[in-house]
Amino acid sequence: MSGETPVKPVEVDNDVEALESAKELSLKIDLPACLNAGDSLSIPSNYDETINDLKQALSLLPLSRSLTNYTIYINGTNVSDSVDDLTTFSQLFELFQWDSVDLLKVTIKERAYTLAAVYEQISRFREIIGLHYVDRMAEDLGVASGVSRLNELTLNAVKERENQEEKDRNEKSEKDEKDEKSEETEESFVLNEEDIKSLKISAEDLSSTIDIDLAATAASFNNIHTKIKLPIKSLTISQWSPVPAFQKNKGDLLYLTLQTLENETFNITCHFSGFFVNRSSTVNFNPEVKVNEKGQVSKNYLLVNLVDSLSPSFSKVLEENELSLSTSSEHPETYLLPNNSFLATPWYIDTVHAKNYPDVSRSQLPLILNGVDGSDYVKDWNEDFQSVRELPNTNIQERILREKLIQKALFDFTKTATDTSVNIIKGNLTPMNPNEEEGKHIYLKNGIFYASDATSVEVFEATGAEEAARYVASKDLAGVKVLNKADVPGVNNLVTCIVDYLGKRIVCQAPVPGIFNAAAEGEEEKVVYGLSTDGSTISQDKSFEEPLKQIAEVFHLKPHTVEVSDEIKSESELLVSKDTKGIKGTDSRKYVIDLYRTTPRDIQFTEAHFDASNDTSYPHGESLLRHEAVAEWWKRKVSALFKAETEKLEKEGKMESKDGEKPQIVLPTDQVVFNPDAFSFDSESDEDREVVRNLSKFVKEKLIEEFLTEFPSQVAPFDGQQLTSILHRQGINMRYLDEQTKATYEPTLANYDALYRVTVQEMIARAAKHLLRKLSADVPVNLFASFVAHFHNCLLGAAVNAQPAVEIEELYRSFYPESAFNFTKLNSDQVIALITKEVFLRFRYALPEDWSSVLIHPIPLMREIALKFGIQWKAQKYVFTAQEFAAYKEKFATTSKQVETAKSKKKGKKIQVVTEVVSERDSIFVADDIVNFVPIVKDSSYKASLIDEIFQSARSHIASGEKDVGLSIFNELVAIQEQIYGRVNSETARFYTLLAQVYSELGYQSQAAFVSRKAIILSERTTGFDSYDTITAYLNSGFYEAANFDLINSVSLYNQAVATWTSVYGKGHPTLINTLTNIAENYSRASQNESAIKLLESALEFSKLANGEVSEITGIVTFRLANCLINTSKFDQSLELYRACEATFEKVLGPDDALTKQASKYVSSIETYVKELAQQAVASGNSKIKVKSQTETVKNGKKNGKKSAIPQPDPEIASKSIDDILQFIEGNNPKKSSKKSKKSKK
């Protein structure tokens, strides 16, 4: 991507080494008496760790986690009040001039509580008892977010195996190598009868056609949080709070009411000295200490200890919870809550997961969490973010802290902005301009500015209006994201996110400080660089030039003059686009906004497809290239310049100086730039326009062509998300989907067929998303489920009911205007026609007339639309044919409650009667099938370059032979990754995926298998249980388990991967061929040849359908099946397949290819062997009996006295490799391993 920070392995290397070599320090901690700790606590640390690290350690340790209000004394000095929490121990030693030591004495002392400290203690209490899990579920915008399925597979524990060091094989013969491998396989795959039975069942499942039951799949979701039991019934702020004036002087801070599991109610006083039970009741106020009949009082400094003393069940339930969590999964990542990322919400869910838990105190959380006066809720998000960006980053510790705080700040902003956006769209908040039309409403809430994308529609009136404004908003966010990663000093950008919910888009930004202030006297315009807000002037504040030069370098922008008209033009060259504005905030910082013009126009596409006067025009004329495309173009251009300069110096003989040093070549990178305002005005130079035109051509003529050329050797995408990710990484915009579709319409490979299928489906899904947005413009929030269900009936249910009706209560109709119900008039033909038109408008692709019946795969398409629009469907069997629907009609019947008014027998009074009405469905979907809608959020977070730098450093050490150093750096990197992103994050999932791969490459298969399980769980929870990241993680893990010689685990993981992608893609993904052949190979290694043959036959059958009978892939699968048949002595069948292979390879690869020659050799050898067996059979008169007798002879260890020219069938040959088998057929018995020889001698 453009603007990425270059890797500096040497500097990072030194930093990591410094991190590893940081002087160790042991902390001996004396805990306060309230913890009943007894002996001191020892914690390992080092001089580079901070006071905050110590506090975090104390909050995580079971012994001290309930302590929240304390003072830290080190060497008798109160450091809590004298230094901040980010101070390192080394800085403390320097500040207080202490002598360097290995053991540091730390004393923790209680503090007097304040109301803020009481709130903090209550929050920690809720966390300890598990209420934070319930809080998270209650406040989550999605249902069953973060579910996982790995634990439901009940895998065996990872086998611990020693790493196999690389051995010098040069001194050994090739035969010995094979014998060693064979011996290793025999020793490693140990299977009992139950294992073999399980493997046979798995092979049957994998080789048969898989039908996915959505309800059964959703029921397998593992949501550990639902297993948490609460150790109390409730703890709430008492009705006697706040503390009256006459009690404040006595030290009372707050009053609580506790209800225990024993159904006892206690009123608790929060005092500056701790917590105690008082004498109050629900009707009488008496905050004095309660003395029981034994003359005892219940008082404790810690709330958790007090509650424990009052409820015998409290500790017992806490212990049960801890046991439940530890036994439910060996990986804490399964149940840990993220602190700086969203969890993925499944697109279909079992309604069992849609639970609510009673908690009176939940509604009081804003009071507890937002400070004593609520001021903590109001944040200056811009100041928070900019302050963190300005933190020092001179060494690795500073960079880690800074990146961690940046990621946290970005997430907290996005979380708050998302919650508020949902409330705005639901109509719960009042806009700043209520008299304007709804699309132009703006809001300023909690330091964040909210606006619809339609607020800037006037700016793009000529180029698509609302469509252009919507597109430009996402491009602005992309520019912000690049700039966040580039981290340009001296200039600031706004923290930004976009929220799409119920067809509406809200752009959220922390505003420039002072932007809403009234203009100062003499100040006419707040924009000091770029085109003014009203478009009347172009400003060029000189103080912006230096930082903007760096921004221009990040985006490869060319300095250029701008002439909008004779009156409106720049005085000198602008460094960025005229639309990028520079503003000075009241905080004295420089800000840049409107970063959508940081890539050039896609002029070739716009000229060809946009015409505002044409009904079939592309929706807008603001099409821009992606940053990845510009970065690739720049890299190739610079590379060409470098090559040309090198060749020039070589010709001139200047490549080496007299002292042998090569000259430094300064790359003229300022030559590889483009004008971001090209094709905006008539005054631009032809040269600038030509550069932008060539850039536009570069995408279509180079990037797309290269993608299609390289695609056959790549893994075909499973779904639209993966396809989008692949194309975006290559710099290809999604508007070019038609190019892939046209190129793969008549596929020659299964991969192309899969690409065509996914591409068409993606176009339809995206068209459906846009139609849902357009058609819902007037639909009220409360009718949205009815609208979406009806749209899906029209799109997917024509075979069941082409004219579906929408049931809406008459009462609802009185609430809204008639236009709100226009969607009920839609039918299947109209929706199909609208989709066809939308696909052509957006992708310039004409769908065939029968696309709705031929190209659609209902469940995968339903999933794609759900993920794009934020729909959560109820998990049940959805059928899409009239025959299936009739069979399931009774099951689909819905029960609803109806309220009727009737006359009472007594005095004729009117009463309301509730009756249950059972009604049969006449369409596939009803509103009740939609469980929830979730917002789709695009944020400005980025991958920290520090992680990549350290990763590359570790890889380079390993590549240069310093394996131990490399692994040591990787171990440090695990901790750094978790520090920056937390243990539950999609970036952490991807990191574990890479780490598992590294371990596997180095031969650490046990570690690879273990780490890959973490990658699966985190992928499921953060990217989705059926995302391509998750599918890939399952496939990788299956491979690592096989390499670790655990076939049962491996097959379970492969089976899950196949089941998942079948629900995502449907039947017949080409990856199935490779997966089945890999599993078959493992079965064969485990001597489960019959199952291996079944799997290979299934793979071959599918390959013939997908790739054709005469294709390289079909030939290779046939070859493997032939090999496997030899293992079972089925020589005739094997020979037939080898002949087919030879013919296929000769046609596809040519007679001189290695595969063709190998197949030919096998044909010749086996023909000879089969002929000799036949001759022997004729001589004996009964081939079956003769072969059997020969086998029995070998089994009994008796050999023919004469040396026979015909090799005897060997029952042990099944365990040999194909080469050994062929050597046997050719008359050369393969040598057995030394271990086997020793065993036979015994």
UniProtKB/Swiss-Prot annotation:
Keyword Cell wall biogenesis/degradation listed: no
Entry GO MF terms: mRNA binding
Primary localization class, coarse: cytoplasm
Domain Clu: 359-606
Gene Ontology cellular-component annotations: cytoplasm
InterPro entries membership: CLU-central (IPR033646), CLU_dom (IPR025697), CLU_N (IPR028275), CLU_prot (IPR027523), GSKIP_dom_sf (IPR023231), TPR-like_helical_dom_sf (IPR011990)
Keyword Cytoplasm: yes
Keywords: Cytoplasm, Repeat, TPR repeat
Subcellular location: Cytoplasm
UniProt-listed SUPFAM superfamilies: Hypothetical protein c14orf129, hspc210, TPR-like
PROSITE patterns: CLU
Assembly and binders: May associate with the eukaryotic translation initiation factor 3 (eIF-3) complex.
Name of protein: Clustered mitochondria protein homolog
The organism of origin for this protein: Scheffersomyces stipitis (strain ATCC 58785 / CBS 6054 / NBRC 10063 / NRRL Y-11545)
Lineage: Eukaryota, Fungi, Dikarya, Ascomycota, Saccharomycotina
